[in-house]
Each structure stands twice: as structure tokens, then as C-alpha cells.
Curated annotation (Swiss-Prot):
Belongs to the class-II aminoacyl-tRNA synthetase family. Phe-tRNA synthetase alpha subunit type 2 subfamily. Tetramer of two alpha and two beta subunits. Signal peptide: none annotated. Its EC number is 6.1.1.20. Mg(2+) binds at residue 402. This is Phenylalanine--tRNA ligase alpha subunit, cytoplasmic.
């Protein structure tokens, strides 16, 4: 009906000036009319222009007064025509809100005499408020003074009305032609006889359910924010492929260490070796491995350059730390705080708690005269920001840190102490060959990203969190991460 009305009207008229007036004139629901207008516009039967008007609609209170009358009139009618009524008796006849507003407005209008007794001052009154509200419901316009009065009493609120003006489009016809909208086999076979609907490249498509952040990314952002709040700067960690030299040798890890075995490390076939290393630094590292130095006896073995040249997928982000500390040593010393959160790779058996690739969080501070007490203080500050205030430290061994400590936190839910990370002070055998001053110390700590994420989101199988088997619904539904709250 709406389509025939629009096309028929335009056949004899230049345009429809206002879709609202048109819908009222032809007794068509405006929402239905708008849908038909959009459809005809899509096929270019008509051209349209938007119309926006500020209209007024009744509030819930306004609707009530439009039906029952204004409070002042309700109060006036409750007062007897002759004589008077006590204020208490009058209050019993009316709702509390009606009585309160009615007293104010009726007194203001000088309709009643207010005291202990209430009596009428006029014989009859006209309920202008109710009349105005009813006319606003019908879409009629009012003078500014009346609108402001009703608005002040919170009986009406503004609303933007949207409609259209309509005129003939380039494809106008008194009757819509049937056009093919789907590229079916039958339609393609009869394409010469058919007219196809044009593509509307301006039309908005269905919202794409995308852009959800993975749980690991949310937790990673929280850790990054904590590091930044503590004054750390992020290290560049984009080189997944690293040489054995920076990954192992520069960290004073011997070449016969089990971690360097192919069973624990992914070595590259192409390119199998690195091209360039800082030769003077390589010589110092070789010397400290073979015969010691800087107060160390070394490992007393034949250090091989070909082992150091082998390329691999980095097994820890400490390889990045070694590069950054070496670069720092080549300039006049400046204290630094570094952190990184990125992927590392281990040639390990995959099970519900281990993957061949995972994420490592690492923080380090390089400054003069640092002690083990400084490390413990920083760790307590760092982990307290994660909501872990109960910490314990246990001596441990790492090839490149001495002393070394495992970090434990008391898990309230499990009711026991849980290992949450590793820490230590980088050895002089690692730092001094780089060229750092003798009084410079480096304290560092690290932990995985996956373990706290699994705890926060209640995941007990790491393969449900990371990898090709992750359920997309988990990514879409996982809540905002708030560490420490």
C-alpha cells in the first residue's frame, strides 16, 4: 500500500515535501513508509533528502496528567464548591505527589485559599495543562512560553524526528519493475531478458563480529602497563631467529650445556649460521669460557666458533637483554630499566601445561652498586602490583646469574606456595666482557605469560589458550583483565 501511494502520488505531483505529513494524510504508519522509501531509493526510483525536526513527547508524568488531569485541577475538584475542607482531609483524598504539586500550582493560579482550611476562590477552572499535553500527543505545535512551562515541570522532553522529502529518481516508474537480486543459475541463463538490481556500494553491511582481543593480549597489556608505571622502557624483540652466540655464549652458558642440545632447541637449516658478530667481543667471551677471567676460572674447555655461529629460534628473551646490555656498554654508562614480553621457542614435549612456543616476561635494571636487597625490593614492588603481596625466595642455579632465586607466591585459592618466576644478578663473566664498568650490576627476573593468564581465566589446559585449537568463542567472550583486583 505504501509503495503504491508513493509512486502514484509522484506520477501527478512533483514531490512529497514531508513524509510525516504524507503518512498522516494517507493513514500509513510512518515507520512502514520509511522502509518503503529506503527500498525505492535503493532501486533509484526516487531521490530523497533527510528532514530533521525537533518535536516534543510526553514524559511518563506528562502521560499520566494527560489521562487524569493536572495536579492543580485534581486538587481544585477535591475542594467542595461551598465551604471548606481541612488540609489533612484534603491530603487523604489525593496522592502525595499530586497534593504537593497541586497545592503549589493551584495557589499560584489563585484558585484556592490555602490555610488550615482550604476553600475555592473561583467557581470553575480550565485544565489548560491537560489540553496542551493532549495536543502535543497529536503532534500539534505550541508557543515557546507554553513549551518552556511544560518543559520546566518535566512533563515533556525534546525528540529529534527524522523523515524525508521525496521526488522522482532516474529510474522512476508508476509501478516497480521486478528485478533479479540473486545470481542463480536460472537467472544467469536468462540474463538478456532480466534486469538485475544494481549494487549499492554505500549501503552498510552487517556488523562484522571481529576485533576481539585474545586473553594473552589483555594480560600482556596489563603487565606492560605495570612496567611502564615503574619507569621501564621496552626492548625491541622482533628477532625470533637468533645466533647461539647471543642466545647462549654471551650469557656465559657453556657449549656442552644440555639446553643447547637439539632435543631442547630448534636449530635452523637455512640459514644455518650467522654472518656477523662483534669480533673483539667474541674473543673476550671465548677467553672467559676457556680460561676464565674477571675473578672466574671459566669452564676449561675448547670453545668452538662454529657452535656460536649456529642460528636457532631463541629459547629465551634474555638473548635480547644480552644485545641491549652490549649496546649499552659501547657508550658512556647511563642507568637503564628494560623490559620485554614476547615469544620464545623450546623443543619440548607438548602436554596440557607445556608448548613448544610460549611467551616470556622479562625485566632488568642496570645501575651502579645494585645488591640482592635491591632485587628483592623491586620484586616485591612488581608482584604487589599484580596482587601478589606474599612472596618467598629460594636459592637456585642459572648459568648467567649468581646469586639466583626462584620466586614463590602464596596462592590463596590453592592454599599453598606456588612458583611464579625466576630471578638473579647477572654474573661478572657476562657483564665485564661486554665492556660495562666494574661497579655496574644488573638485576633481572622473568616469568611466563601463559601461567598467570591461565590462573586469571580459569584455564587448565594451555592448548585451550594458545595455538590452532583455541575456541574462538573463548576469545569473543573472555572478560576484561584486571590484574591485582
Amino acid at each position: 500500500m505504501a509503495e503504491e501511494a508513493i509512486l502514484g502520488f509522484l506520477q501527478n505531483n512533483e514531490q512529497i515535501t514531508d513524509s510525516g505529513q504524507f503518512s498522516a494524510e494517507f493513514n500509513i504508519d510512518h515507520n512502514e513508509l520509511v522502509n518503503v522509501i529506503k527500498s525505492l531509493h535503493g532501486f533509484r526510483y526516487i531521490d530523497v533528502q533527510d528532514i530533521k525536526k525537533e518535536t516534543w513527547i510526553l514524559t511518563d508524568e506528562g502521560k499520566k496528567y494527560a489521562a487524569e488531569g493536572s495536579p492543580e485541577v485534581q486538587l481544585f475538584l477535591a475542594v467542595p464548591e461551598e465551604g471548606s475542607i481541612s488540609k489533612d482531609e484534603l491530603q487523604k483524598k489525593l496522592a502525595p505527589a499530586v497534593f504537593k504539586i497541586g497545592c503549589s500550582q493551584a495557589g499560584k493560579n489563585k484558585w484556592v485559599e490555602m490555610g488550615k482550611q482550604v476553600s475555592r476562590k473561583v467557581k470553575d477552572v480550565e485544565d489548560k495543562v491537560k489540553g496542551q499535553l493532549l495536543q502535543i500527543q497529536q503532534g500539534k505545535e505550541f508557543d515557546k512560553e507554553s513549551i518552556n512551562s511544560l518543559k520546566a515541570r518535566k512533563l515533556i522532553v525534546p525528540q529529534i524526528w527524522k523523515g524525508y522529502s521525496v521526488k522522482k529518481g532516474p529510474n522512476y516508474a508508476p509501478e516497480r519493475k521486478k528485478v533479479a537480486t540473486d545470481l542463480t543459475r536460472e537467472n544467469l541463463q536468462n540474463w538478456k531478458e532480466l534486469e538485475f538490481k544494481e549494487y549499492n556500494f554505500k549501503a552498510k553491511g552487517a556488523p562484522v563480529d571481529a576485533g576481539h582481543l585474545h586473553a594473552l593480549l589483555k594480560v600482556r597489556k596489563q603487565f606492560k602497563d605495570i612496567f611502564v608505571q615503574m619507569g621501564f622502557e621496552e626492548m625491541p624483540t622482533n628477532n625470533y631467529v637468533e645466533s647461539s652466540f647471543w642466545n647462549f655464549d654471551a650469557l656465559f652458558q657453556p657449549q656442552q650445556h644440555p639446553a643447547r642440545d637439539s632435543h631442547d632447541t630448534f636449530f635452523l637449516k637455512v640459514p644455518s649460521t650467522t654472518r656477523t658478530l662483534p669480533e673483539d667481543y667474541v674473543e673476550r667471551v671465548k677467553r672467559v669460557h676457556e680460561s676464565g677471567g674477571y675473578g672466574s676460572r671459566g669452564y676449561n674447555y675448547d670453545w668452538k666458533r662454529e657452535e656460536a655461529n649456529k642460528n636457532l629460534l631463541r629459547t629465551h628473551t634474555t638473548a635480547v637483554s644480552s644485545r641491549m646490555l652490549y649496546a649499552l656498554a659501547q657508550k658512556p654508562f647511563v642507568p637503564k630499566k628494560y623490559f620485554s614480553i614476547d615469544r620464545v621457542f623450546r623443543n619440548e614435549a607438548v602436554d596440557r601445561t607445556h608448548l613448544a612456543e610460549f611467551h616470556q616476561i622479562e625485566g632488568l635494571i642496570c645501575d651502579r652498586g645494585l645488591t640482592l636487597g635491591d632485587l628483592i625490593g623491586v620484586l616485591e614492588d612488581f608482584f604487589s602490583r599484580l596482587g601478589m603481596s606474599k612472596l618467598r625466595f629460594k636459592p637456585a642455579y642459572n648459568p648467567y646469574t649468581e646469586p639466583s632465586m626462584e620466586i614463590f607466591s602464596y596462592h590463596e585459592g590453592l592454599g599453598k606456595w606456588v612458583e611464579i618466576g625466576n630471578s638473579g644478578m647477572f654474573r661478572p663473566e657476562m657483564l665485564l666482557p661486554m665492556g660495562l664498568p666494574e661497579d655496574v650490576r644488573v638485576i633481572a627476573w622473568g616469568l611466563s605469560l601463559e601461567r598467570p593468564t591461565m590462573i586469571l581465566y580459569g584455564i587448565d589446559n594451555i592448548r585451550d589458550l594458545f595455538g590452532h585449537k583455541v575456541d574462538l568463542d573463548l576469545i569473543k567472550r573472555n572478560p576484561i583483565c584486571r590484574i591485582g583486583i
